[in-house]
Amino acid sequence: MSDTDGKKTLGLRGGAPRPGNVKQSFSHGRTKNVVVETKRKRVVVPKAGATTSAGGKAPIGDPSRRPAGISDAEMERRLKAVKAAKAREAEEEAARIAEEKARAEERERRRAEQEERERAEREREESLKAKAEEDKRRKDEAEAAAKAAAAPAAEPVVQRPAAKAAPEPAPRKQQDRDRDNKRGGKGNDDSRRSGKLTLNQALAGGEGGRQRSMAAMKRKQERARQKAMGGQVEREKVVRDVQVPEAIVVSELANRMSEKVGEVVKALMNNGMMVTQNQAIDADTAELIVQEFGHRIVRVSDADVEDVIKEVEDDEADLKTRPPVVTIMGHVDHGKTSLLDAIRKAKVVAGEAGGITQHIGAYQVKTDSGQLLSFLDTPGHAAFTSMRSRGAQVTDIVVLVVAADDAVMPQTIEAINHAKAAEVPMIVAINKIDRPAADPTKVRTDLLQHEVIVEQMSGDVQDVEVSAITGQGLDDLLEAIALQAEILELKANPNRAAQGAVIEAQLDVGRGPVATVLVQNGTLRQGDIFVVGEQYGKVRALINDQGERVKEAGPSVPVEVLGLNGTPEAGDVLNVTSTEAQAREIASYRANAAKDKRAAAGAATTLEQLMANAKADEDVSELPILVKADVQGSAEAIVQAMEKIGNDEVRVRVLHSGVGAITETDVGLAEASGAPIMGFNVRANASARNTANQKGVELRYYSIIYDLVDDVKAAASGLLSAEIRENFIGYATIKEVFKVTGVGKVAGCLVTEGVARRSAGVRLLRDNVVIHEGTLKTLKRFKDEVAEVQSGQECGMAFENYDDIRADDVIEIFEREEITRTLT
């Protein structure tokens, strides 16, 4: 016994909980010892004799009830497994019953809470209603007391009981506390609100781990509240008024509708528009999308900024007579500029390259009678269609010049159409009347075909026979112009803000952007702030047609305007504004509107059109070029002429067109695209020339548009594939077929027509049907290889890689010729 003094013998522990310490680690090196209690589940197993007594079954060792081949140990093991399974089923059933009971209690608790809330809400509403009635009663009593003019009334008797009944919120707070206490640990939002800590929590990090945020708890409470109130209420669709301008970006449209960008893009694709969120669409497409999403569209326009330059009707008393604007039009080389020279007594033709007018010239002439006439001389070449159109739009009278020895030509017809479209009166000047081959009657007769009936043909169109060389009929022409101007009663108000049209624009090296403007109304003065197209500026200087500086220009006066911030387009309208801010805002709006429209036009392409264009471009060769010209009108005319060059196989693509000298930027663009640079009346600066020489960029200079168009047409013709043409040179008939070792079958032939050549192509005809086409392997005459065999001679022929030849077959000999094609 001495060995066991003070020691406990080994044995099994009871079912009491075993305490233990767990070391819990947190961030920043903090630790905490946590006491953890673990409880062992007690497995309830029936007693050993219970099964036998209850079921009346035989004992384990009863050989009569035991299956054959089963030992006692195996039988005992099976019985224990059955007992354990039954015990587990009993535990699971008990757990299920407990869980259902807990769920029922939870439902009951929530129902009680809901009823409590409804009761509290009813009490609050009743309290508010009673308070309102009490206030109304007091007000009525006060009014009655005031009417009776009695002494100051004492406090209402019912005020004290009301004061006693007032503290209503106190029981409600107590009820809320009681309800919170009833919820217990299971109804709490998070386990961190309880004081217990389980083993899993301690091992997983416990309180030091990631906790649920207050926002998550609030969301959970909100979901529970909505669930208790009968489920989430479906949010109603908000119908908005969506403002849509002329062009809008897809993402901006989605933002204004408060819709997802992806949904808007999907709707556009369903309507056949392959666009992204950064592309712009037009207003009509945007309206369809807005209506599809159930919103209301409000069409707006950014053009409100242009209200300050809207045309104002002038009073009749302010209008004064102005000089007429006369445009001289006609076919090339019919003497338009020479006629104007004779009127102005100057030499304009000498200043034009090749004697061809390539700009719109604006001049003012004073007649012998003292009357002022403003003349516009338009080009007659086919490339300057847009210039003639602009000249017809700003003019009052059109003088149609027709050569008496050439009659009506294509540009003459075009000028007639421009005049009719602009609805301006016409005067026919039959020029070159001094020529021996002049036939003015033929001119008048030809004009009848185009609905131009002159006075000598009982019409209302004046016609004058003139000669720019001898001066014959010039006075009659000026008299006819003055008469027509008197009939039109041309008037304008000089005492208002100026308005005019840009006839021509160019980028001058020393003076910057220069615009030739024909003032149509008002007076343009030095220092005026103006907007013209997408550009704006302040009038720095005004130069008239004589090259002299002037302070102002009235109606129908052509002047050159200096002081623009950029080169405007020919045909733009000039308007004077009161402030520079207005001019800048209008110019910015116009530039953005033009850019948005170009983007919207490019985006409005369906997938089928994209695929069709891509397939068409595969078979078309392109000649890229860059165009730089001295004035905007010439650049525009060259671009239009380039667009007309080409066919289904080749076309000319103008990568860039601009005004001014050729710069290094142009050379860089030309090098990247492998394009030549065409300079029309401009030259490259020194740095651009050096860069072009280093990078191998071709620079071409022109002063006559004929030469430029012809050179580009010749270069484009070089991209055309050559035409293959077959020329038949002879026929031969096979008389007999021989077999030669090392060669194969050889045809003994008689050349019946033409000549047979070794280098030519051959076809084998059998019963007039082509059965083979190829080349000759050998051509022999008397065992000698020959280059050709003349008609009537015999020879031997062997085909390359073909042996199926028979007697009486016919051999057709031909040669292929490549013919260079040109563009017409």
From Swiss-Prot:
Residues 355-359 are annotated as: G2. It is found in: Cytoplasm. The keyword rRNA-binding does not apply. PANTHER family: TR-TYPE G DOMAIN-CONTAINING PROTEIN, TRANSLATION INITIATION FACTOR IF-2-RELATED. Residues 86-144, 170-193 have a biased composition (Basic and acidic residues). Residues 1-32, 45-232 are annotated as: Disordered. Keywords: Cytoplasm, GTP-binding, Initiation factor, Nucleotide-binding, Protein biosynthesis. Its main location: cytoplasm. Residues 321-489 form the tr-type G domain. Residues 431-434 are annotated as: G4. GO terms for cellular component: cytosol. InterPro entries: EF-G-like_DII (IPR053905), IF2_assoc_dom_bac (IPR013575), IF2_II (IPR044145), IF2_N (IPR006847), P-loop_NTPase (IPR027417), Small_GTP-bd (IPR005225), T_Tr_GTP-bd_dom (IPR000795), TF_IF2_bacterial-like (IPR000178). Belongs to the TRAFAC class translation factor GTPase superfamily. Classic translation factor GTPase family. IF-2 subfamily. Gene3D superfamilies: P-loop containing nucleotide triphosphate hydrolases (3.40.50.300), Translation factors (2.40.30.10), Translation initiation factor IF- 2, domain 3 (3.40.50.10050). One of the essential components for the initiation of protein synthesis. Protects formylmethionyl-tRNA from spontaneous hydrolysis and promotes its binding to the 30S ribosomal subunits. Also involved in the hydrolysis of GTP during the formation of the 70S ribosomal complex. Residues 330-337 are annotated as: G1. Residues 377-380 are annotated as: G3. Residues 467-469 are annotated as: G5. It comes from the Bacteria. This is Translation initiation factor IF-2. The gene is infB. Residues 45-57, 145-167 have a biased composition (Low complexity). GO terms for molecular function: GTP binding; GTPase activity; translation initiation factor activity. GTP binds at residues 330-337, 377-381, 431-434.
